[in-house]
């Protein structure tokens, strides 16, 4: 494939934006390949400015669960645009999407719309601290919750360690109120609560980790979080920005049967437009302004375009949608295992609903340490060869692969064949 126009566009972009991008992963640095500039998408396909066609498994990093340019979403967006883009006042569209979210997400009795997943997690932590009167938050190593200061934290050497900044610009004073423990490790969490339990406001977790690849919870982990937080009077917060409506019809919490106190949402609930949300029990949510004294606001929160796209996306999802995802996922997983075995290359495949992650190691992969054992050099080679075969995968080992309702069995079979062809060139 030729990338001449993308390479020229990137040269210009690098003079205008840091690294030429507005989000780091789009620079494609971890796979050592030129950034691709996209032109348009349709269904399961995406097309770059050089005219190359790809089967798309990035799907805008998750939001496009119906694929690109879904007719129902696009039609209603045109109607909404004709009325105006934003009013700075409430619209009926906010009621419609809020009611749909409340009906489908077990933990949410009231919801507040915001404009991004980062905003949702940031506001949720402020609410948790304000509601409990405590300062510390527990997060898990390898789980990403947006780029707010208190969540850009890495683990130290101890089992339960007060956080150190993971990025310059994050004050140590803020970092010290974040405790990081290994994902899927209840013993480590218990130690954290034994040390700091009286000052832990909440535990935030991706119920399926999606930012170290795709790493589902081991049996009993989520229920263990529920039990421990309840025992200590801390809040359990599910960050379902990625898993929300991707793992199941009632999100990950419905799929796994564990109900948190607060939930963060994003991605799918905007259908491709900037949206986030957080919600939970009425008794907690009523502490948010204007009812309570915990402040939160947003100029474009609940804007009519995002509410339209979100509602028209979620309204098309049914329990049968997830049966379809499971069918496609079964075919893809079986095909990957068969092809990699054929070429004697180790692979571990993790799945949750329409999220799929593959690691180039023997496995299992249940935490960030194990995910880091993947062969990153081989992953980069695989990415480049798959792009040549017309398959657009996430350009990072630590990002998930997504399915949409627009994907077909034919797409999956072509993808499996592309892996076979790519491996034939890589493995000598």
Swiss-Prot record:
Record EC number: 5.4.3.8
Protein family (similarity comment): Belongs to the class-III pyridoxal-phosphate-dependent aminotransferase family. HemL subfamily.
Main localization category: cytoplasm
Source organism, top-level taxon: Bacteria
Assembly information from the UniProt record: Homodimer.
Entry-linked SUPFAM superfamilies: PLP-dependent transferases
Source species of the chain: Staphylococcus aureus (strain JH9)
Localization (cell): Cytoplasm
Molecular function in Gene Ontology: glutamate-1-semialdehyde 2,1-aminomutase activity; pyridoxal phosphate binding; transaminase activity
Pathway assigned in UniProt: Porphyrin-containing compound metabolism; protoporphyrin-IX biosynthesis; 5-aminolevulinate from L-glutamyl-tRNA(Glu): step 2/2
Cofactor (UniProt): pyridoxal 5'-phosphate
Protein name: Glutamate-1-semialdehyde 2,1-aminomutase 1
Residues the record lists as N6-(pyridoxal phosphate)lysine modifications: 267
Gene Ontology process terms (BP): protoporphyrinogen IX biosynthetic process
Keyword annotations: Cytoplasm, Isomerase, Porphyrin biosynthesis, Pyridoxal phosphate
Pfam family, one: Aminotran_3
Record carries keyword Manganese: no
Catalytic activity field: (S)-4-amino-5-oxopentanoate = 5-aminolevulinate
PANTHER family given in the database record: GLUTAMATE-1-SEMIALDEHYDE 2,1-AMINOMUTASE, GLUTAMATE-1-SEMIALDEHYDE 2,1-AMINOMUTASE 1, CHLOROPLASTIC-RELATED
Disulfide bridge positions per record: none
GO cellular component labels: cytoplasm
Enzyme's top EC category: isomerase
């Amino acid at each position: 494939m030729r990338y001449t126009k993308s390479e020229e566009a990137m040269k210009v972009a690098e003079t205008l934006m840091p690294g030429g991008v507005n989000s780091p992963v789009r620079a494609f640095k971890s796979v050592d390949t030129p950034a691709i500039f996209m032109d348009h998408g349709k269904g399961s396909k995406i097309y770059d400015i050089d005219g190359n066609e790809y089967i798309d498994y990035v799907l805008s990093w998750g939001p496009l669960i119906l694929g690109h340019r879904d007719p129902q979403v696009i039609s209603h967006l045109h109607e909404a645009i004709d009325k105006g883009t934003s009013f700075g006042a409430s619209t009926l569209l906010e009621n419609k999407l809020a009611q749909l979210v409340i009906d489908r997400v077990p933990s949410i009795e009231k919801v507040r719309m915001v404009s991004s997943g980062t905003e949702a997690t940031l506001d949720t932590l402020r609410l948790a601290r304000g509601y409990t009167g405590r300062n510390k938050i527990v997060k898990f190593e390898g789980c990403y919750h947006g780029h707010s200061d208190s969540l850009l934290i890495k683990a130290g050497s101890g089992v339960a360690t007060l956080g150190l900044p993971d990025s310059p610009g994050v004050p140590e004073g803020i970092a010290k109120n974040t405790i990081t423990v290994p994902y899927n490790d209840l013993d480590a969490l218990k130690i954290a609560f034994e040390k700091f339990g009286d000052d832990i406001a909440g535990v935030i977790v991706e119920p399926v980790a999606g930012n170290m690849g795709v790493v589902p919870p081991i049996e009993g982990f989520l229920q263990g979080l529920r039990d421990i937080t309840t025992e200590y009077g801390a809040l359990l917060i599910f960050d379902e920005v990625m898993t929300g409506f991707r793992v199941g019809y009632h999100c990950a919490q419905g799929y796994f049967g564990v109900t948190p106190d607060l939930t963060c949402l994003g991605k799918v609930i905007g259908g491709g437009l900037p949206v986030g949300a957080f919600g939970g029990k009425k008794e907690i949510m009523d502490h948010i302004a204007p009812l309570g004294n915990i402040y939160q606001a947003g100029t474009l929160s609940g804007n009519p375009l995002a509410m339209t796209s979100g509602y028209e996306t979620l309204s098309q999802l049914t329990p049968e949608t997830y049966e379809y995802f499971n069918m496609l996922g079964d075919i893809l997983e079986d095909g990957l295992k068969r092809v990699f075995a054929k070429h004697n290359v180790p692979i571990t495949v993790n799945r949750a609903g329409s999220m799929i992650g593959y690691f180039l190691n023997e496995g299992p992969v249940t935490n960030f340490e194990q995910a880091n054992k993947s062969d990153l050099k081989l992953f980069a080679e695989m990415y480049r060869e798959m792009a040549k075969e017309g398959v657009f995968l996430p350009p990072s080992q630590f990002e998930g692969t997504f399915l949409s309702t627009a994907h077909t069995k034919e797409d999956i079979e072509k993808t499996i064949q592309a892996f076979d062809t790519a491996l034939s060139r890589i493995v000598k």
